[in-house]
């Protein structure tokens, strides 16, 4: 029986993927083996020795102390793509709403309540909210992952010319893209051509302030910028300067901050990207499945701090070892198994930066002290025997 602690409300459809005869959901557990989390900040949350894995029902893991988890042999999962449709739909809606000035128009229309001259005032006032159609305009998409590819394809369907920039595009994402999406080798190739610009990359130290004074200077005057990925991807100070100069006509984002609120030309939604029932369910189901497969079988899929390693069970016992990605690690592991007269039926080893994961199926008499012996080798971080 595994104990799972939830730090946020998790869709019951997702929790149903953790059968009650194998998993206990205890939100007050002091020593859980797994944690399910959405947006709760875990940086000040103690990580008990019992904890084997954290599954984030969402894509970003900024709220999780990933490095500390890695050092303790705790696997951190996320759910890439589970909320992609929800975010992509919101971006398309923001493209339309922003271009046609719908937010300001709706707010203005509300001020007409109680007047006897509403029809007349509407005809007179609507000219203040005239905005361009999307058809025939050019959209630049930075990042062509699950969300960016969907946005690009939707924009093509709306009749836009779509330019894409992603030096790390995956094969799956490339296959999913419309042939009409034009590939740009550099931002310099793309930015001067865009009427609209949207960014869809993960937040990393290397992507912080991707939209900055330098990149904005490359854009054509009057560009409309959208950010439904992470607030830190845009340098707000540079963005506000560009708004004041007319370089940027509008900034539509999902991350309100004190400096952005109330600024003319800025539309902020309250982090609605994944806020749909379908998205929450998809993320919860995926997170629960990842957590279950790891706890029961040692398989890792969609981890942010360890390599993806998965293999079917072939009988016997399974040994799961998180260790330093260092020379001699595999030799040390197999030497101990040989001394224990265990036969390796199947083995997978993969590394990810400084850490590696080895999954072994063995036959023979697995004694209680095997995990202790394996854990004593210098490269070992954490050992489980299933």
Annotate each predicted stretch with a short phrase.
Residues 43-45, 163, 167-260, 275:
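Rossmann-like adenosine-cofactor binding region
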Residues 88-107, 153-160, 285-299, 334-338:
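Oxidoreductase and adenylate-handling cofactor-binding alpha/beta cores
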Residues 144-145:
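Glycine-rich Rossmann-fold phosphate-binding loop(s) that bind the pyrophosphate
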Residues 1-79, 212-214, 218, 224, ...:
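An N-terminal-biased, well-structured beta-alpha scaffold segment characteristic
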Residues 301, 305-386:
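A conserved regulatory-domain signal marking ACT and ACT-like small-molecule sensing domains
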Residues 80-138, 299-304:
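Phosphate-binding beta-alpha-beta segment of Rossmann-like dinucleotide-binding domains, i.e.
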Residues 148-149:
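N-terminal Rossmann-fold NAD(P) dinucleotide-binding loop
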Residues 213, 221-313, 357, 386:
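Rossmann-like dinucleotide-binding domain for NAD(H)/NADP(H)
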